[in-house]
């Protein structure tokens, strides 16, 4: 808003609401908007025999292994994984490790969704 002033005849609460709404829409149209997705800090504890399968699962284009340790005779893998990639992971982990691995996660941060995925999301929302 530039050079705004109140005038007893021309100014009203509704006029200011409309002007504010128009300014917000214009700013949103000019802004570079991105879609963000949650990244989860994942920790998998597994027997040594299944380490290769676990690492294979946690590697990928939107997954990042942060650290690998040994704790109480088991291997521990810490990774960052998108929340979308975590859905269904517990079942996959159990089947690949015969139920011997454990898994925990907590929110870590947000990251920008890759452009090719963002375009699909926008197209899907616009189609509704």
From Swiss-Prot:
GO molecular function, one term: GTP binding
The family this protein is said to belong to: Belongs to the GTP-binding elongation factor family. EF-G/EF-2 subfamily.
Keyword Disulfide bond in annotation: no
UniProt keyword terms in alphabetical order: Cytoplasm, Elongation factor, GTP-binding, Nucleotide-binding, Protein biosynthesis
Domain of life assignment: Bacteria
GO cellular component, one term: cytoplasm
GO biological process, one term: ribosome disassembly
Function comment: Catalyzes the GTP-dependent ribosomal translocation step during translation elongation. During this step, the ribosome changes from the pre-translocational (PRE) to the post-translocational (POST) state as the newly formed A-site-bound peptidyl-tRNA and P-site-bound deacylated tRNA move to the P and E sites, respectively. Catalyzes the coordinated movement of the two tRNA molecules, the mRNA and conformational changes in the ribosome.
Compartments (UniProt record): Cytoplasm
Keyword Signal: no
UniProt cross-references to Pfam families, sorted A to Z: EFG_C, EFG_IV
Identification of the protein by name: Elongation factor G
Species of origin: Planobispora rosea
InterPro entries: EFG_III/V (IPR035647), EFG_V (IPR035649), EFG_V-like (IPR000640), Ribosomal_Su5_D2-typ_SF (IPR020568), Ribsml_uS5_D2-typ_fold_subgr (IPR014721), Transl_elong_EFG/EF2_IV (IPR005517)
């Amino acid at each position: 808003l530039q050079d705004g002033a109140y005038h007893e005849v021309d100014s009203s609460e509704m006029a200011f609401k409309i002007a504010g709404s128009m300014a917000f829409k214009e700013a949103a149209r000019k802004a570079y908007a991105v879609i963000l997705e949650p990244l989860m800090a994942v920790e998998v504890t597994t027997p040594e025999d299944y380490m290769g399968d676990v690492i294979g699962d946690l590697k990928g284009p939107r997954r990042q292994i942060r650290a690998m340790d040994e704790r109480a005779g088991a291997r521990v893998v810490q990774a960052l994984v998108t929340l979308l990639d975590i859905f269904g992971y517990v079942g996959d982990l159990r089947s690949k490790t015969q139920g011997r691995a454990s898994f925990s996660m907590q929110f870590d941060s947000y990251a920008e969704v890759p452009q090719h995925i963002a375009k699909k999301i926008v197209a899907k929302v616009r189609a509704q």
